Amino acid sequence: HVQHLALIYQPQNDAVGCELVVNRSLYRGYSHFAGELGFLPFNHDGLKGETLQRSPQLLLEKQIETLCCVFNPEYVVIYSEVLKDKQDFNLTSIPIMHQPKIDWIEDIDKLILIGLYQLALDHLKEGDI
């Protein structure tokens, strides 16, 4: 069973995001900001939108390398509305032993429903509902 996983969502607009799973539990961070890849420093001053249109694979590579350094996931799963073909990634700044397995998903709708279900369960457990 995978313990540490990152799911990257790359839409056609620049609202890229990521879900982080730590020890098989969704990690949100103290202010629920964990996974907001669009705010990484190399995405500043509108460059993110330009890079997304010009070189979406390069943008994903930078995001994956950042995740490897900060989070060190075993798997990175990607859903991209921009890259239609599965790509091989050039993660040269990350030593091979620290590179994650990378997989692609075709349909994110099912995962969104599962995530919403899990959020509702979490709120019930915490007594928020």
Regions found by a protein language model. Give the residues of each.
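ATP-binding/phosphotransfer module of carbohydrate and carboxylate kinases, centering on a glycine-rich
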Residues: 26, 44-129
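Phosphate-binding/catalytic loop of phosphoryl-transfer enzymes
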Residues: 1-45
